[in-house]
């Protein structure tokens, strides 16, 4: 019977050559590179940056309330000029105000007229209303920036986790490929032994079943790996089917334990929640002060022309006579405007904003409670994951030894194929466990960094 070890040696050499060729042909991307790609290219993060730019424009808009308003108007009309003593109400804000002498009869002969006005209105005292609006706009900028930083941090955590899961899946594909190679050797050797009459026919059937099972495991591992590649490339902002990642030092070292547990009060999600509280409070103050009056300095100048002479009351219906200015005026003054009945609306709006402040405070407390739990859970997970990762090499060594013994006994005819197949399954499970526990140790470290809100706790261990 052919030696199993000779078959393994040939397969090992061919797979090694194939692996080296594949590694040299594919350019691999590091974790730092894909983190930067995700930061620059992911569309949702770009939307948060646009939100910041919008908030910056709103604060510029709020600051324009410090400036005086200048309104210029120029108009040309064709109308009659009958008038009467008495008052009238405007028509939805438009006051139709004919100007002329009071006569006993109406004259329906229209003439052209012109009017040009310039009005400057400067709210020099507003009792803090403009300042409150500016502070609310600044608080909204801080909220938008905190929102972006939180989304960026959460996105980077997703990228790192997807990177680690892809590395695990890659290793699982390698493990299942090795398992398939072993199953193929068993099948070839067993078929030869059965054909020569050295082994019973049932061994050939068992070997075929184990080979089919190994192929199924490899196909499932390959499927999971391809799905994870797509997921990671999506997080980078560019979908790629064959993204290649660098294993870096994830499978040459285990993460080291930290002496003290990191805090979580600087977590970006808490910072964002606090910014929401501050922004809501600033809006409530702006609403409260909107009831206060304003004191304005006013200056105006205007000129008017008419087809009716201001000297002889003579009518001229030509356009040129109507648009030529006949009189000029100016005005300077100070005024106060205060809508006293507006207090009812402002009071309810202020209460609504106060409830919003209370809402964001409770959201902050909820997130604080969750992060406290996540921090403690991450500590526990990290310690257990490290312990598991240190034990799996022992498991793998024992499984390899058991496989070698079962292989030798099978070749000597001292045991059956079923016992050898069991040792192969145990060895495959040990290889898979080694890769999974190693990856889970790094993922547990990532969980600690995510709870603390500081990704450098993870990245610093890669240097």
Model-derived features with residue positions:
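Bacterial Sec-pathway N-terminal export signals of envelope proteins
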Residues: 24-75, 81, 239-283, 339-340, ...
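Short flexible linkers and secondary-structure junctions
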Residues: 27-162
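A short glycine-centered flexible hinge/capping loop motif at secondary-structure junctions
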Residues: 194-198, 410-414, 451
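Sec/SRP-type N-terminal targeting helices
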Residues: 46-50, 63-64, 108-110, 124-152, ...
